[in-house]
Amino acid sequence: MRLCSVLAALLLISFSAHALVSPQSQSLSHGASRLEIVLEKKDKESWQAVDPGKVFLQNDLLRFRVTANFSGYLYVLNHGTSGDYTLLFPRAETGQENRIEANRSTNVPATEGSFRISGPAGHEVVYWLVSPVELSSEKIQSEYIPLPPPPKERKTPPKLIPRCDDKIFRARGDCIDMSAGPQGVADDSLPDNLAAIPAVSSRELLFERGQSASVVSAAEASGKPVIFEFRISHR
């Protein structure tokens, strides 16, 4: 996947989204933490919400719209089908301000840019992370470390061929890959820079998906980061 008009090869990254209890973020101790992700595709001059499992084509332009019921700092990293790891957000081309405010939508990229589908067919693996403190800040609590750069070693993800769900295709004519979208991630499959961050187990997260939005939630605030992945299926 390419960052339209800026990067030669930009891959989506997996990021963990989570509310941590700290003076710099809203406490969720009185309610469940909830993160809604809307995947949007550019259609001519407008953006349209699409099914998270939609199978995209080469050169399709995408972006995410994120809304949480908590405040924190958002980090997004991509493991592309070519094997490269790339930090998608924050960075100069996609927006340096990565603080998200409770109940306020944030676009990724936060600039006027977009992500362009490219590379071998398969699944882009996007990792999400929301921290109560800025990971590059000197004020980080002792148990947290600045987010290291993505691994330089190319590691081609398992080959997953995009497949249309026959029932959905017959019902509404859309090619939807039910293995795409948000899901938990095993600790041993995380890139090194994310594996070093103590996080809530994916088993403690709930994943819901609809035709135009996905929701990742936790029943209780745990005081730890949460890491999950969002798979983008394309031909």
Where are these regions (language model features)?
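Bacterial N-terminal signal peptides
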Residues: V6-F15
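Secretory-pathway glycoprotein ectodomains that are cysteine- and/or Ser/Thr/Pro-rich
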Residues: A17-Y73, L77-R235
